[in-house]
Structure formats: structure tokens, C-alpha cells
């Protein structure tokens, strides 16, 4: 309901006077007040806005979807599509709107977005509206409309298309203002135009043709759906020529993963990236959409949701960076140089709020004037965040170089700013030149808005201030400063409005027709109109009122030239016009006492005039690769300068080099007779970059002796891709509890926490910079900055003696779970889990009598932020039956989905729970969940010949399916079992490989190769019948290239490393008598080692032999493959350890546990090997390590000097081998230094693997350069292939035949396919089983359709079935075979293109421990992971560093968890370090299940 009224405020006396004056012919027609009209609404008006330079205003009623429009500033209103039949309107507009958006650069255009794909546009300020359709709803996560900064007809529409399973963000574009609309592409975080602002268009005229149609989009990773893999891609053809686009070269000519946001600011585009394993952001900036640079903030760390890009200028970016804990909300204000690359600190302790808003505003229209609020008592707030903060206001007149107090005469003035703003629009200023207003108080600091606030005004851009009105007011400025309106704002009803026509010196009063509580006051964005709109409500929230207040009648005279002044926008300390950016700025503005209004040119925004100045030092900035010195007086090199070729023959020479200064681009100062800081200067050659020699002599070694008996554990705290710094940090604990730290990869070590004995190191599972150092007492220590400093907290209990002590949260970095022994008077004390949300500052009890509790949060697991799983004893008794207890509210309430459990483990999206089988004595069964809410029994294949399931090992789930090892024999030295593979929700399994080797500790000889989809190696026991009789195992190595669907022997090389043939007569093809066999995971000294590295795709090492079966390690040779295991060659006789450097540019070998002084290295993918002597004395090498990502040029040898007890670490530095970075052309893929390598299957043509062809950059072996890339990178998915038999595997109850087909297991019935309908009531159809199912990883399209031949309608859905597609209709791609809801993060796109590489999990069947690893953007984690058996809980802890002489019962190496990258010691295979890790137990009697079942069997025998 709308009620309208109009009244004119006049006094009777003045009315009589006006009548009398008119009767004698005087031309005076003033009114004594504004005209006021109002309407009443039943709900709050939303999204009000004026068309700039007009009196046309719109707002939206959210409850009805109605759009209200007025052409006279709010006097008369109509509902579009309802009240009037205006040209172009349609009936759907009457109640179909969800938002209104004005075009930011074209004041004629606005858009109304509807609910159901129907939208409207106006190109004439609302006079007419035109309907257009886009088949998507407006995006809820991205800005629905993105505008072009030069051509207002170009608009990107960002929407979402939803299915029953998920919503997909997608973008459309128009080049003619939605006359036509075309789809562009699916996105992750939306798209934007490169030319996104008019300022960008003006500053890039030289690139106009190249970037005119360029679009930038944040899209999913090629193989990973999570934010850590998001990419920034661009296209100049709306992705028509190339569907994926070209990745933007953000960092030194290389793409960057983890793009979380991109935005345009004036003449810049800013992109933020966050790598996995860190909370630190990297910011990248471009001013031409072609060349990008990383923005440098000195030593300040930028975190997600902890920085704010503020309103900048056309020559700099303003960023406020939080520099304290989030609870204190204070920041540092930075200003960039002109290309946005180097930021300098302007002012510290800026006042922020929890949402990231900062008390900062640039004065509109005036260059260089900035208002900020800072926290005066910042030290007190940092010590006590709950203390009252004392905020003070500061102003700068020189672009933030210096700040001073605001003054009312001799008193300091403090104003409420953005964080406490009580209106809409700008806070202090408007386009009205020089008029600045605010609510605040004088005194020592800012006080209460309501109780102490008054309205203050300045008409000289903040130089001087005066009291305008007592008490707080909402205020607006109109007619370019000629009229100021205000209404009291103290949360009390009022009917009085006040206005001033002389810059706030004097005020008049008018009254509304009723008292209201003001909600907001606004006018046209350019502050040119004489009309204002006031919105308020009475105490009943159902009664809202909109007032249109028109001051046009106050004066009738139009301002003349004599009514204007030439006002200088900035004054120096002497009161003279000041220079900035090489000019002085002036405005022609109405004098404050002029008795006139500006009506003829009312809607023209004031424009400044400029006068040039001579260049001074302030007109220069630091050149690229230079930064300000500490005293800000010089520009010093940010990197070592390179001398020109032919110069610097001696260190005493000099060369002509840059001064470090440059004139700020856009600065218009005159150079004649002025300062010239940018002239070249003489620089000393001794400070120039020395070119590496490029030969083997350039390899260096640095030895350090550690005074201890044995190394204990060590971890790399590797910098993630978005982290700043150059360090390569390792933390190491010795067996006597000493902590050593190196920041230069072992070239030097320091002893830290000298008075503390460290029992364990527990690196943070998700953040590389963090690690915790656990002691035997309550006081514990940690670092959050890669061991630069250390802090302490008090633990709620002692360290867990038999399991994981600390658990970490994936999203909330300071949330932790501590599990340790509770207090009791006698006997075994039950364990208690505690939670802290503040990094150990305080603790609360989660649950008592537990084995473990874990956070279950995952980015793709809906509503899992507070989800916690606990393994608890029933009745809180130590000997009580164990049950799975879950909660989403920290156990204020809880559920118990499963009882009588043995353990649970998480692996990528899967949660696997082992429980006792109630139907089979002494046997286990598996339950699975994806969403953490619904659980289902796992269906094992009937041809799985394991009558009593004694233990499980969860091997891998990196390819949308779980590999599970089911133990068939767990007797000492006889263990083996079958590997089965699940469907996409972990509940239905098929047999993959029989008789796979398992050791006494429960670990399995199975390993996925890092970075290669579907490639795995396993060792099988070839003589199981003899083993059952007590014979020694004979192992045979097998390999799969299609994710376990088919296994083959490993092809042997034709000749050995000496060119001799093998005795078994190898011809390069594997046979039962002659194939390659490799020692696997169960024989590794260090469980973090792997065959390959995720950063060196396709490069593999292994130790083994060629023959009929696997021989002894003492007689083994070292083999190498460069094509992902398809072919191999012997590179060395003997047992060598290996590591990969610089993504495979350097391969290093060193002999294991034999005295040596030499290593071998290759720089040509293993074709040739050079020897390097690293020590004069022989060293027995116990381990060889490098950064987990395999991207460093440094390696570290850990060993003992032969013949002595001295422990030594030796750093090997290869950085001097090459003198340049390889040239990469990401656009074309190949270049002089790179070729594109495609993984392939040895038995398939066309390099198709899992339905697509992948391409990776590989450095050419002949190129003498460094990759210098921090992460492995897929160049592109070349194309999807047509489906073949290799894209299918045998379905449940079917098995592979000798001819390769799948047939029903004899004696079994086909699965009852109609069960799917019962389990999924909304399903329309089901498919008759064919014996085949698609491999979850495949993305093939078309071709052979082996899994869906005949579809049937589900009962009660026959009509829908016929309507949908009939017998051959669309496939329900996400079919779920058992009653469990799959948690899908990104819909069909994610399912078909994500390989889910998140590693492997180990639930140990020993000593209540588990072993879990994971890998986010990196392909695979290779450690077999979950072992479950018996009755003792398996808990996630790190496996013991299995190096002889280093093991101890209490020592273990903790490696971080699932999402990484995370720090751990040596395993290249965990390139980005994603994983959970668990304790590898020395005491095998503690193994889960094995000994208990044996005891029971023994009892029966007795």
C-alpha cells in the first residue's frame, strides 16, 4: 500500500508578505522552506539509487519483488509493470525483481535482475525498459553484472545454473547491452573485463586493440576443484577459439594457482592468490592487462580476509593490511608506487572492523587529502582486546606521506568514519568541492556517536573545522555545496529537518508531517540536485516512510559569475596553493554567502582546473626493482643489479646504472631547471650480480656437525607458493630432545629453545608456517612463522601416550583439538579431548573417554565447519565398547551413527569406519560416508576370497574411489591380502588385485605414482600356497596404468647399466620369467620416500632387479623411468637413494648406508651422470632430503662420519650450475626450453588416459636453464577422448575374463537395479546392469557405452521418464548406488574434470595408531594409508622415521595432514605436503586386531 502526500512549509506572516509584495510588482518568489512529499510503505525500501545528473530514483521492495520509480526526486511514484503501461514494460516486471543495479559508467543505463532468467534494462534513465533473457539466475557469490570501462554496451552477466546436486557458476556476455546474449564459460569466482574502468581505458590506449575485448575469469583447476587450484585465465575471443583460455602470467612470466579474487581499481587490476598450506596471500597487479608483477609489502604478511583494497588514485593503490590478531582489528595503511608493485607504509594502527571495513576516505574531487582513524592506545588493545579502544582522527594533505590532527580552533577533532557510518554513500565528502562533514567530538579521542557526537563541517577540504549542529545528524550535500541538509540521528523519533545555504554556518528548520526515526538520507551521487530523499520508520517496523524534500524554491536567482570563487583545493603550510603530481588544483565554486542556486548547469559535475609546477623530489618514486630506504630518503635495489655485458672486469670497476628513481607516471611537472633524480649514476661492480659458471665445479657443499647421539625427526617448513621470503627452513629434533633450526637448507643451524626438552614435533596439518613442539609437561611451544620466533601455551593435559595429541582445523587456523590422558586416582586413565579456538590460549572439554577426536571439515563437505568425529568408549569407561560419536555443535548435542567400531579414517572425500561384523565372528566390516552424516555398509565383491576379514588398509582415494587392502593372512612374515576398489562414494567394491604383500606392521606394497593419474605399483606374493605352509615370500612387481582395472608385469630394460644383457634374456617385454621387480613401501627406511615427485611428472626411480621375482636389496640395482613407468633403464649398480630438484632439472643419487664421499647427479633426465665429491671424509648416508615439492636446487645429506660418532649434515647447492631461468611461452606451450609431454597408456593409442589427454611442460634435457617454478603445473587438458573399453571396469558381482570382458560371477544374481529407485525417491530412471561401470576418473565422451544400455522408469515416475527423454535419455551422472548422499563441491564440471588427488590414508593396525596423508592440488600421495584391525583404536600420528639407528619407541616423525602443502621431512612424493600421518609402531604386539585374533585362535586350539 502506498499513501502519498505533499506539503509546503511556510509561515502565515511570510505568506501575507509575499502576497503584498507581488501586488506591487516585485519579482521575488521565495518560499520559506522546502517542498516535502511522502509515501508510506509496509517494508524497508532496498537498493535505492538516483540516476546521476537527474531526479529519477528507484528502489526495490524485497518482500514483493516490486520496483518503484520516480521521475521527480520522490514526489510521485509508480510500480514498474503495474501502475502504468509504459513502453517496453512487461507484466513480469511487476513482482519479479531481485536486485537493481545502475551502470557505473553510463548514467543512462540501469538493470533490473529477475528471479527466473528474465531481466530488464533501460538506456534512457528509466523512461523505457526492455526485457531480455539469460538462462541463469543472478549469481549469489559473484557480482551479477560486470561492466566495461570504455564501451557501456559490453556487460558480463554472472549467474548460476543449478541441478539436484549442485550449482555451477557460469558467465554470459553481451556487446550490445543485452540486445543479444551469448554464453561464455563456467567459472569458479566469476569473470571481468580487462578494461574494467574508464581510468584503465585511458591509461592503456597503446594496447587498446589488443585488450579491448579481453575477459579475465577465475576458473577451476584442470585437475582439482578446490580454491587452491583456481586459475586466472583470459581470452580475447570470449573463449570461442580456446574453451579453456590462456593462463595469465602473474609471477615472473609464470601462471599462479590459488586465485581467490580479482578486482579493478582505477587504472589497475589486482588479483589475490593463496596457495595450499598457508594463510598468506600474494597480490599481483597489472596496469595494462598484459604484464603482471607481485606486489611487495616489505615484511608485512597479507592474509585472506585481513586486507582491504581501498579507494585509490590514478597513480597508486591504497591497501590496509591487518597487522594484529583479528580480535583487535588494527591495520597498516600502505600506498603503492605507480605500477602497484612496491608498497610503502603510510600510517600504522588504522581502525578496522570484523568485516574488513577501514576508517579511511579520500576527499572526493581533491587530490592528496585523506582522512583516517587510528587506534591511539594500540599497545593496550594488543594486550587486552576487550579494553576500550581510543580512536583518534588524522588527516593528510600530501597523499599520506604525513598526517596531522583535525582542528576546531585549538582543539583536536575526532570523527566517526566508515566502521560506524550511519548513512549510505560516502562518509565525509561529496563531489561538492571542498565541503567535508562528519559526526564526532573534540577532546583526546573519539567517544560515543549517540551520546557525545555533534555535527562538524569544513569548507576548505579539512584544513579548518567548525561546529555545525549539536547532537549527531545524518547529512547530505546538494547543488554542488549550495545546500546542506541534516536530520538528528540519536535513535529517537523526530520531525525536524535542518538545512544551510552558506556551507553550514547558519541553519534553518523545516518539519515533516510526522515523527520518524531516520534510516538514511540521500541525494544524487554527484551532489548536484536540490532534491533529497529521506527514509525513516516509526517505532512500528511495519510503517516505513519515504520523504522527497525539494529546496528548489528557496531561491529563484541563478548564480552569476560574481557568485563564484576560484578555490584552491590544497594549501601548503603557508596557506598558498600546493603542488601534487606536478600541478596545482583549483575549482570554480559558489561562494558560501551567495544568495543563489546553480540551476542552469545543475547536473554538471564540477571539474577541476590545473596549473603546472616545477619538478621536485616529491614527483619521483622508486623505479622497478628498487625500494625506499628505511629513512625514505633513497631508493635502494630490491635485488642484486646485473651489470651490462662487457663491464665489470674487476670488482673495483663501476658501471652506469639506474639511479633507482623515476618520475611518477602521470606526473606533469615541468623539468626545466628542476630536480632530476632519475639520471643514471655510477654503481660499483662489486655490488653487481655475478654470473654462475655453469659447470659442475659450481656445485658447492657445506658440512655441519650436530652434537647429539642420533637424529630424531625433521621437517621442512616449506614456503607455499603465495608465501613471501626465500628461506628453506628445516626443524629437527634430536633423540635427546634438542631442537635445531636452519633457514638456509642446512648450510647453518641454530639451537633453539635451549632450556626445553622436546618430545615430539607436530607440524600444523594445513599451514606450512606452523609447528608445535611438545614436551612432557603442560607448557608447550609453537611457531607460526617458520621458526623465526617461538611462543608458548599451557596444554589441558599431558601428551597422548598412544596416539595423536593435536588435531587441526582445515579452515579455522587457530582451532585445535588436544587429546591426552585425563586425571584419575588409579588404573588406566581415560583420554579426554579438549578444544581451543584461540591457538591454546584457552581450552574446553569436548568429550571424555575417547581414543581420538577429529575435525571433519572439508571444503566440499557441506555444513562441516563445526563437524567433529570422536571415537569414544561407551559409558565413559576405559574398557567400554567403542562407538562413533559425531557433533556439529561441539557436543552440546551429538549422535552415535555406529557402535562397536574399531577405528575410522578420512581419505580425501571419504570417511571409512571399521566395525566388528555382527554376522561373522572375529571378522570386520567397513562402513563409509562422504558427507559425514549418512553412513552405508560397504559391499565387497563375492569373488573376494577372504572369509575372515582381519584388517584393512585404506590405500588411496585420489581418483574418486577408495583402494582398500583386505588382509587374508596376518601371520608374522606371511601377511598378504587383496586390493579392492570402490565406486565414487566408497561403498561398492570390485576386486582389483589379489595376494598383495603386507608387512608385519600392516603396511602394503602399493603406491600411486605422484602426479600421474591412475598409475600405481604393487608387489604381490606369487607363492601364497607355499607361504601358508611356512615358506618365505616371493614377490613380483606389477604396474597399472588405468587405476587398477588392469595390472601387468613391469617391462624390464633390455640391457643393464654396463650394456650387458640380463641373464633371464630380457628383450624389453615383461614375461613371467623376466620382468622388473622393485622394492616397495614396506621396505623403505623413510616412509615418506617415493618412486617419483609430483613436480617432476613422469620421472621415476626404483631399486630392484630383473628376473623372475624380487631379490635382495644388497644385490639390487637402481632403475629410472622418464615416461611414467612404461619403460625403464638401469642407471647404477647398487642400492641408491634419490631426490628430484627444480622439478626434475637436477636428479641426485647417493648410495644408501655405505661409506661414500660422492654423489651422482644428472641434468638431462638421467641420460648422463656426473660425479661430485661432497666430503674429504667418507660418510655413511642415512638419508637424502630436499624440499617436499621437489623444486629446490639444494639437497641435504644426513649421515655419520665413517669411523667416528660424529653426526653430520651436508648441504649440496646446485644453483651455480645454470645462469638463467628457462623461457616459457604458456600461450603456445612449447618454446626453445620446453616441450609438451603427455602421459600415456602402453596399450592405448592417442595418449588418452581416463578419457582425456593431459599436457605438461617439461624442460628440454639440452636446455641449460632452471625451471624456477614453485609448483607442478598442468599446461592444459588437450581434449576429451571418445570412450573405449579402457574407460570401464567390472561392476559389482562381475569379474574380468581372460578375453578382457566382464562376466557375472558364477552362482550370483545380477544386482537388483530397481533398488536405486527405492534409495533415491526423486530418481526418474534406473539402468539395467551390464557388467561394466565407468571408471570414476574418466572424462571420456561418446564412443563405447558399456555401462548404460537399457534404462527403465522408476515406479511412479513413468510420465516424467517419458517427458524427459524416453528409453535413451540423459544419464543421471551422479547416480549413488547405496543410501548415502555424496557431497559434491562443484557439480558436473568438478566430477568430470577433477581427479581428486588428495592422497592416501593410513589407519594403523598397530598400537592404536593411524597413518594418513593427503595431497590437494598435487596429484597423488603415495603412502599406503589406512590399516584397521582388532580392538585397539587407530589414531592419526606420524610414522616413525624408519631409519636404522634413528628409531626409538617414543620417537616418531609427524608429517602434516590432508590438505597441505604441509611441512615434513624428505618425501618429494608429497610435493605440496598434503597428508595425515600416523605413528609407525615398534612394538608389533600392539597392532590392531592381529594379536587378539591370534590369541582367540590359540584359545580354540587349546
Swiss-Prot record:
CDD domains: Sialidase_non-viral. The chain crosses the membrane at residues 1370-1390, 1423-1443. Belongs to the VPS10-related sortilin family. Keywords: Glycoprotein, Golgi apparatus, Membrane, Protein transport, Receptor, Repeat, Signal, Transmembrane, Transmembrane helix, Transport. Its main location: Golgi. The keyword Transmembrane helix applies. Residues 1-29 form the signal peptide. It is a multi-pass membrane protein. This is Vacuolar protein sorting/targeting protein 10. InterPro entries: Sortilin_C (IPR031777), Sortilin_N (IPR031778), VPS10 (IPR006581), VPS10-sortilin (IPR050310), WD40/YVTN_repeat-like_dom_sf (IPR015943). The gene is vps10. Residues 30-1369, 1444-1502 are lumenal. One of its GO terms (biological process) is Golgi to vacuole transport. Functions as a sorting receptor in the Golgi compartment required for the intracellular sorting and delivery of soluble vacuolar proteins, like carboxypeptidase Y (CPY) and proteinase A. Executes multiple rounds of sorting by cycling between the late Golgi and a prevacuolar endosome-like compartment.
Amino acid at each position: 500500500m502506498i499513501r502519498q502526500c505533499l506539503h509546503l512549509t511556510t509561515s502565515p506572516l511570510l505568506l501575507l508578505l509575499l502576497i503584498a509584495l507581488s501586488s506591487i510588482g516585485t519579482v521575488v518568489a521565495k518560499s520559506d522552506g522546502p517542498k516535502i512529499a511522502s509515501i508510506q510503505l509496509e517494508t524497508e525500501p532496498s537498493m535505492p539509487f538516483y540516476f546521476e545528473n537527474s531526479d529519477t530514483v528507484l528502489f526495490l521492495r524485497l518482500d514483493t519483488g516490486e520496483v518503484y520509480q520516480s521521475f521527480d526526486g520522490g514526489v510521485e511514484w509508480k510500480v514498474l509493470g503495474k501502475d502504468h503501461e509504459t513502453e517496453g514494460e512487461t507484466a513480469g516486471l511487476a513482482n519479479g525483481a531481485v536486485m537493481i543495479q545502475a551502470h557505473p559508467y553510463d548514467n543512462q543505463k540501469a538493470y533490473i535482475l529477475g528471479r527466473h532468467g528474465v531481466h530488464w534494462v533501460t538506456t534512457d534513465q528509466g523512461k523505457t525498459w526492455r526485457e531480455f533473457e539469460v538462462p541463469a539466475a543472478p549469481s549469489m557469490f559473484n557480482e551479477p553484472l560486470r561492466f566495461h570501462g570504455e564501451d557501456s554496451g559490453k556487460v558480463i552477466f554472472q549467474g548460476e545454473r543449478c541441478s539436484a546436486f549442485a550449482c555451477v557458476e557460469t558467465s554470459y556476455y553481451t556487446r550490445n547491452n543485452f540486445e543479444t546474449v551469448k554464453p561464455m564459460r563456467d567459472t569458479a569466482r566469476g569473470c571481468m573485463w580487462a578494461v574494467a574502468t574508464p581510468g584503465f581505458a585511458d591509461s592503456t590506449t597503446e594496447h587498446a586493440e589488443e585488450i579491448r575485448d579481453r575477459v579475465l575469469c577465475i576458473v577451476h583447476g584442470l585437475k582439482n576443484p578446490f580454491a587452491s587450484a583456481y586459475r586466472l585465465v583470459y581470452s580475447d575471443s570470449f573463449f570461442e577459439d580456446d574453451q579453456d583460455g590462456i593462463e595469465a602470467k602473474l609471477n615472473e612470466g609464470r601462471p599462479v594457482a590459488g586465485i581467490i579474487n580479482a578486482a579493478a581499481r582505477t587504472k589497475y587490476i589486482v588479483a589475490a592468490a593463496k596457495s595450499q598450506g598457508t594463510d598468506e596471500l600474494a597480490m599481483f597487479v597489472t596496469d595494462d592487462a598484459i604484464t603482471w608483477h607481485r606486489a611487495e609489502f616489505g615484511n608485512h604478511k597479507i592474509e585472506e580476509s585481513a586486507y582491504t583494497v581501498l579507494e585509490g588514485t590514478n597513480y597508486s593503490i591504497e591497501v590496509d593490511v591487518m597487522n594484529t590478531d583479528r580480535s583487535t582489528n588494527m591495520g597498516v595503511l600502505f600506498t603503492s608506487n605507480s605500477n602497484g608493485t612496491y608498497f610503502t607504509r603510510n600510517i600504522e594502527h588504522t581502525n578496522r572492523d570484523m568485516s574488513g571495513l577501514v576508517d579511511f576516505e579520500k576527499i572526493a574531487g581533491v587530490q592528496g587529502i585523506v582522512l583516517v582513524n587510528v587506534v591511539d592506545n594500540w599497545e593496550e588493545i594488543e594486550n587486552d582486546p576487550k579494553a576500550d579502544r581510543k580512536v583518534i582522527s588524522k588527516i593528510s594533505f600530501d597523499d599520506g606521506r604525513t598526517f596531522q590532527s583535525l582542528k576546531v580552533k585549538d582543539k583536536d577533532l575526532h570523527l566517526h568514519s566508515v566502521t560506524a557510518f550511519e548513512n549510505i554513500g560516502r562518509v565525509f565528502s561529496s563531489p561538492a568541492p571542498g565541503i567535508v562533514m562528519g559526526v564526532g567530538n573534540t577532546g583526546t579521542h573519539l567517544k560515543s556517536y549517540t551520546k557525545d557526537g555533534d555535527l562538524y563541517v569544513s569548507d576548505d577540504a579539512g584544513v579548518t573545522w567548525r561546529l555545525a549542529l549539536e547532537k549527531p545528524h545524518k547529512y547530505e550535500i546538494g547543488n554542488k555545496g549550495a545546500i546542506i541538509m541534516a536530520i538528528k540521528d540519536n535513535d529517537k523519533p523526530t520531525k525536524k529537518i535542518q538545512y544551510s545555504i552558506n556551507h553550514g554556518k547558519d541553519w534553518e528548520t523545516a518539519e515533516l508531517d510526522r515523527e520518524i526515526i531516520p534510516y538514511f538520507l540521500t541525494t544524487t551521487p554527484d551532489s548536484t540536485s536540490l532534491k533529497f530523499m529521506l527514509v525513516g520508520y516509526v517505532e512500528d517496523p511495519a510503517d516505513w516512510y519515504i520523504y522527497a524534500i525539494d529546496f528548489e524554491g528557496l531561491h529563484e536567482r541563478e548564480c552569476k559569475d560574481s557568485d563564484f570563487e576560484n578555490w584552491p583545493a590544497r594549501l601548503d603550510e603557508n596557506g598558498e596553493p600546493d603542488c601534487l603530481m606536478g600541478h596545482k588544483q583549483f575549482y570554480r565554486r559558489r561562494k558560501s554567502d551567495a544568495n543563489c542556486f546553480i540551476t542552469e548547469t545543475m547536473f554538471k559535475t564540477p571539474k577541476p582546473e590545473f596549473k603546472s609546477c616545477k619538478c621536485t623530489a616529491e614527483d619521483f618514486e622508486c623505479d622497478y626493482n628498487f625500494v625506499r630506504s628505511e629513512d625514505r630518503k633513497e631508493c635502494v635495489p630490491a635485488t642484486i643489479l646485473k651489470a651490462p655485458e662487457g663491464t665489470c672486469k674487476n670488482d673495483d670497476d663501476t658501471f652506469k646504472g639506474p639511479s633507482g628513481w623515476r618520475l611518477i607516471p602521470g606526473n606533469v611537472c615541468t623539468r626545466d631547471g628542476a630536480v632530476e633524480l632519475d639520471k643514471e649514476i655510477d654503481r660499483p661492480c662489486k655490488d653487481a650480480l655475478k654470473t654462475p659458471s655453469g659447470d659442475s665445479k659450481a656445485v658447492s657443499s657445506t658440512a655441519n656437525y650436530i652434537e647429539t647421539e642420533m637424529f630424531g625427526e625433521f621437517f621442512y617448513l616449506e614456503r607455499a607458493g603465495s608465501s613471501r621470503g626465500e628461506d628453506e627452513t628445516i626443524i629437527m629434533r634430536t633423540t635427546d630432545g634438542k631442537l635445531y633450526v636452519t633457514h638456509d637448507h642446512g648450510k647453518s643451524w641454530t639451537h633453539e629453545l635451549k632450556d626445553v626438552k622436546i618430545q615430539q614435533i607436530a607440524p600444523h596439518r594445513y599451514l606450512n608456517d606452523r609447528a608445535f613442539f611438545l614436551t612432557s609437561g603442560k607448557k608447550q611451544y609453537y611457531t607460526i612463522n617458520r621458526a623465526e620466533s617461538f611462543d608458548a601455551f599451557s596444554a589441558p593435559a599431558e601428551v597422548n601416550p598412544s596416539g595423536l595429541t593435536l588435531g587441526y582445523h582445515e579452515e579455522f587456523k587457530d582451532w585445535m583439538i588436544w587429546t591426552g590422558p585425563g586425571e584419575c586416582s588409579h588404573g588406566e586413565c581415560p583420554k579426554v579431548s579438549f578444544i581451543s579456538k584461540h591457538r591454546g590460549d584457552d581450552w574446553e572439554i569436548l568429550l571424555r573417554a575417547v581414543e581420538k577426536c577429529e575435525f571433519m571439515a572439508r571444503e566440499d563437505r557441506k555444513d562441516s565447519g563445526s563437524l567433529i568425529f570422536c571415537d569414544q568408549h561407551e559409558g565413559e569407561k576405559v574398557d567400554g565398547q567403542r562407538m562413533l560419536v559425531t557433533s556439529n555443535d561441539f557436543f552440546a548435542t551429538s549422535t552415535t551413527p555406529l557402535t562397536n567400531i574399531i577405528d575410522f579414517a578420512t581419505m580425501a572425500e571419504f570417511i571409512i569406519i571399521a566395525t566388528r561384523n555382527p554376522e561373522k565372528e572375529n571378522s570386520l566390516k567397513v562402513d563409509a560416508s562422504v558427507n559425514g552424516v549418512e553412513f552405508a555398509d560397504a559391499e565387497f565383491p563375492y569373488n573376494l576370497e577372504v572369509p575372515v576379514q582381519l584388517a584393512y588398509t585404506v590405500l588411496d582415494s585420489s581418483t574418486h574411489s577408495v583402494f582398500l587392502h583386505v588382509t587374508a593372512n596376518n601371520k608374522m612374515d606371511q601377511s598378504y591380502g587383496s586390493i579392492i576398489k570402490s565406486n565414487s562414494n566408497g561403498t561398492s567394491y570390485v576386486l582389483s588385485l589379489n595376494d598383495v604383500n603386507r608387512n608385519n606392521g600392516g603396511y602394503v606394497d602399493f603406491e600411486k605414482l605422484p602426479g600421474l593419474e591412475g598409475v600405481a605399483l604393487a608387489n604381490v606374493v606369487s607363492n601364497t600356497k607355499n607361504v601358508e605352509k611356512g615358506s618365505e615370500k616371493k614377490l613380483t612387481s606389477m604396474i597399472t596404468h588405468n587405476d587398477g582395472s588392469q595390472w601387468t608385469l613391469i617391462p624390464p630394460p633390455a640391457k643393464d647399466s654396463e650394456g650387458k644383457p640380463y641373464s633371464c634374456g630380457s628383450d624389453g617385454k615383461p614375461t613371467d620369467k623376466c620382468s622388473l621387480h622393485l622394492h616397495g613401501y614396506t621396505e623403505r627406511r623413510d616412509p615418506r620416500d617415493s618412486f617419483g615427485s609430483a613436480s617432476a611428472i613422469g620421472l621415476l626411480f626404483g631399486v630392484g632387479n630383473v628376473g623372475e621375482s624380487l631379490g635382495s636389496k644388497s644385490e639390487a640395482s637402481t632403475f629410472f623411468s622418464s615416461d611414467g613407468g612404461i619403460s625403464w633403464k638401469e642407471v647404477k649398480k647398487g642400492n641408491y637413494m634419490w631426490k628430484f630438484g627444480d622439478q626434475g632439472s637436477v636428479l641426485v643419487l647417493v648410495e644408501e648406508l655405505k661409506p661414500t664421499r660422492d654423489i651422482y647427479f644428472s641434468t638431462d633426465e638421467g641420460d648422463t651422470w656426473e660425479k661430485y665429491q661432497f666430503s674429504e671424509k667418507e660418510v655413511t648416508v642415512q638419508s637424502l632430503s630436499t624440499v617436499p615439492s621437489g623444486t629446490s636446487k639444494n639437497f641435504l645429506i644426513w649421515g655419520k662420519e665413517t669411523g667416528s660418532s660424529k653426526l653430520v649434515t651436508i648441504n649440496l647447492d646446485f644453483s651455480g650450475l645454470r645462469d638463467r631461468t628457462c623461457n616459457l611461452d604458456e600461450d603456445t606451450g612449447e618454446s626453445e626450453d620446453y616441450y609438451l609431454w603427455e602421459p600415456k597408456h602402453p596399450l592405448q593409442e592417442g595418449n588418452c588416459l581416463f578419457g582425456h589427454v593431459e599436457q605438461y611442460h617439461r624442460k628440454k634435457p639440452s636446455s641449460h636453464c632452471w625451471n624456477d617454478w614453485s609448483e607442478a603445473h598442468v599446461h592444459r587438458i588437450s581434449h576429451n577422448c571418445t570412450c573405449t573399453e579402457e574407460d570401464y571396469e567390472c561392476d559389482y558381482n562381475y569379474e574380468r575374463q581372460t578375453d578382457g570382458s566382464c562376466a557375472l560371477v558364477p552362482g550370483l544374481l545380477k544386482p537388483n537395479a530397481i533398488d536405486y529407485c527405492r534409495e533415491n525417491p526423486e530418481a526418474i530412471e534406473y539402468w539395467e546392469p551390464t557388467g561394466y561401470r565407468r571408471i570414476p576418473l574418466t572424462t571420456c565422451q561418446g564412443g563405447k557405452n558399456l555401462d548404460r544400455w537399457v534404462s527403465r522408469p522408476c515406479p511412479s515416475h513413468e510420465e516424467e521418464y517419458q517427458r524427459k527423454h524416453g528409453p535413451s535419455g540423459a544419464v543421471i551422472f551422479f547416480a549413488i548406488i547405496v543410501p548415502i548422499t555424496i557431497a559434491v563441491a562443484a557439480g558436473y564440471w568438478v566430477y568430470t574434470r577433477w581427479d581428486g588427488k588428495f592422497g592416501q590414508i593410513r589407519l594403523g593396525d598397530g598400537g592404536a595408531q593411524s597413518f594418513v596423508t593427503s595431497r590437494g592440488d598435487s596429484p597423488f600421495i603415495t603412502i599406503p594409508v589406512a590399516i584397521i584391525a582388532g580392538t585397539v583404536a587407530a589414531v592419526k600420528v606420524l610414522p616413525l622415521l624408519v631409519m636404522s639407528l634413528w628409531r626409538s619407541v617414543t620417537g616418531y616423525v609427524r608429517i602434516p595432514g590432508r590438505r597441505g602443502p604441509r611441512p615434513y621431512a624428505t618425501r618429494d612424493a608429497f610435493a605440496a605436503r598434503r597428508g595425515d600421518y600416523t605413528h609407525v609402531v615398534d612394538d608389533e604386539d600392539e597392532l590392531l586386531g592381529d594379536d587378539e585374533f591370534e590369541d582367540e585362535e590359540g584359545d580354540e586350539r587349546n
